[in-house]
Regions:
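Membrane-helix interface linkers and caps
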Residues: 1-6, 28-90, 102-119, 143, ...
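Hydrophobic core of alpha-helical transmembrane segments in multi-pass integral membrane proteins
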Residues: 17-27, 56-65, 93-101, 261-276
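Select subsegments of transmembrane alpha-helices in polytopic membrane proteins
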Residues: 20, 86-95, 160, 257
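Alpha-helical multi-pass transmembrane bundles of energy-transducing inner-membrane proteins
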Residues: 7-8, 204
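Mid-bilayer segments of alpha-helical transmembrane spans in multi-pass integral membrane proteins
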Residues: 89-102, 128-129, 133
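C-terminal ends of transmembrane alpha-helices
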Residues: 100-110, 164-173
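Transmembrane helix-loop-helix hairpins at the membrane interface
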Residues: 2, 13-14, 18, 121-305, ...
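C-terminal TM-helix exit segments that contain a strictly Trp-centered aromatic cap at the helix terminus
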Residues: 24-30, 98-104, 218-226
């Protein structure tokens, strides 16, 4: 009965949180932006900037409103942390760059032309950053956060990662075989777990957004598919082709589906999980090791509830 009541509470919170997020973003796109366009004359480029910045601002406001209004707590995960954000971006870019360098060295990826820096890349970078932040707000901030406070860090991580993976399968489902889609599903779960662990270790949405965006933009710069999307490849400094089987190159989904990348991501996730299990002493439902805490286990509806034992994997 208790678990059923908890599940109902989780479902209600998710409905409220995502209704706020969706409503804020759509309200800006369908109501506020057209009103601004009526009042002020702007060219296509300026309108695009206003649209992206407005969507971002509304999403952040919706998240802030949910946390302050429904969770009744400070929004610590949106506090600025310049050094940690920089480190997150460097870690994200370096991780996927290492995998792609190996794939280029093995001949799985071949650069066919050097186009140099393209004028549209700055706009792509901004779009990637906004998309990464929206995903982090939705998946790590809301979905993972609500699940974690109900059932603990590790169950929440895997549940959220399954949803994250499922939502990305559509990117390449019409161009991939069943085996390739299964590989993509596993890759998506691992990436969801990786970004969850980055968030768990930092408790900062800006840091995990920087990691996520830098990871994605590095893939774009190499001229290979990004999560099954080819839209930005013509703007990449490198024109690249993938040659070889799907397990080696990632095929139409890109380097995230390559076995090498999946192995690296899995190793990072396992290392962070083990480090957390060995070092995180749980006190009042929240770790005392890092600021704001790392792990929550069986915290129920009160993240500052009774002390819990050390996490056991």
């Amino acid at each position: 009965m208790l678990e059923f009541q908890r599940a109902k509470t989780v479902l209600l919170k998710l409905l409220v949180a995502f209704a706020l997020l969706f409503g804020a973003v759509q309200g800006f796109r369908l109501l506020l932006l057209p009103a601004l366009q009526t009042l002020f004359t702007a060219d296509a480029a300026l309108t695009s900037v206003i649209r992206r910045c407005g969507i971002l601002a509304c999403a952040l406001f919706a998240y802030w409103a949910y946390v302050r209004g429904f969770e009744k707590r400070p929004v610590r995960e949106l506090r600025p942390a310049p050094l940690a954000i920089t480190a997150g971006a460097l870690f994200g870019a370096a991780s996927i760059a290492l995998c792609m360098l190996v794939l280029f060295a093995l001949g799985a990826y071949v650069a066919t032309a050097d186009r140099g820096w393209q004028g549209g890349l700055a706009g792509v970078a901004a779009l990637i950053l906004i998309a990464a932040l929206l995903e982090e707000i939705a998946y790590r901030g809301l979905l993972f956060g609500i699940l974690e406070r109900a059932w603990g860090t590790l169950p929440a991580m895997w549940l959220q990662s399954l949803v994250f993976s499922a939502m990305h399968l559509a990117n390449a489902e019409d161009r991939a075989s069943t085996v390739e889609l299964l590989t993509t599903a596993v890759s998506g779960v691992l990436l969801g777990a990786l970004w969850t662990m980055v968030y768990v270790y930092t408790r900062n949405l800006w840091v995990v957004t920087a990691h996520h965006a830098a990871w994605n933009f590095t893939i774009i710069l190499a001229g290979v598919p990004l999560s099954g999307l080819d839209d930005w490849r013509p703007l990449a400094p490198l024109a690249s082709e993938y040659r070889g089987s799907h397990w080696l190159t990632g095929g139409v989904f890109g380097p995230e589906d390559a076995l090498l990348t999946m192995a690296l991501v899995a190793a990072c996730v396992i290392a962070m999980m083990r480090a957390g299990a060995q070092s995180a002493t749980i006190e009042n439902g929240v770790s005392v090791i890092f600021p704001r805490g790392r792990w929550v286990e069986n915290a129920g509806e009160n993240p500052r509830g009774p002390a819990s034992p050390r996490i056991a994997l």
